[in-house]
Amino acid sequence: MIRLTPRDEAIIEFLNEVKVADTQTLCNIFFNSKLRASQLRLKALVDYKYIKAYRENVISQNIYYVKRKPSQIKHSLILSRFIGELYKLGIEVLKIRVPLKVGNVIADGFIAIKYNNEPKIFLIEVENTKYLNTDKYVELKQTREYKSKFPVMPSIICISDKNNKTDDRLDIIFLKTDLSDIENLIMKL
């Protein structure tokens, strides 16, 4: 039996929140991008059954989860990789909620960050098969239902490879699913 460290407990809590994460994401968030240290500790957590691991094939990374393997692994992985990239860029992540219901809208995730000592809030939508439905967010803004949870309407981050339509009434930041254009987010912060 191994003794759980505060970092181990934070890893388990993170996996409970986002459902699934790969080795590189957990490395970026909890191990200061030290891959070998993260692999060894994650293996110990798997061996002692604190977390579970899955690998699609021999050359892919391990994918970690706590309870049972999610049905939409790719969708959940994109969201957790996005959070890992924020940590890698040195952006302070204050709060994460996956998913979050605001009024009639169920966003894939909510994230509160601090960048240049300025707090920002975002609703996250991961669209790997369909297009972003901006109508539900326009309705959320017009009915002011977001006021029950937030002081201002959060910006929307849409992670998708599709050519989604924009709406001038909303503040939407588009990112690709491989997150190769994450600098777009930093430029708009």
Task: Locate predicted features.
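Short, solvent-exposed loop/turn segments at secondary-structure junctions
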Residues: 18-21, 129, 163-164
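Nuclease-adjacent, charged terminal/linker segments that flank catalytic cores
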Residues: 1-69
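Structural beta-sheet core signal
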Residues: 123, 155-158
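Basic, amphipathic alpha-helical patches used to engage nucleic acids or provide basic targeting signals
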Residues: 132-153
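Domain-level recognition of nuclease-like catalytic cores that cleave nucleotide substrates
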Residues: 157-189
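Active-site metal-binding core of divalent-cation-utilizing nuclease and nuclease-like domains
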Residues: 70-71, 85-122, 128-132
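Hydrophobic, Leu/Ile/Phe/Ala-enriched alpha-helical segments that form helix-helix packing faces
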Residues: 30, 42, 46, 82, ...
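A broadly used, surface-exposed interaction patch
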Residues: 69-83
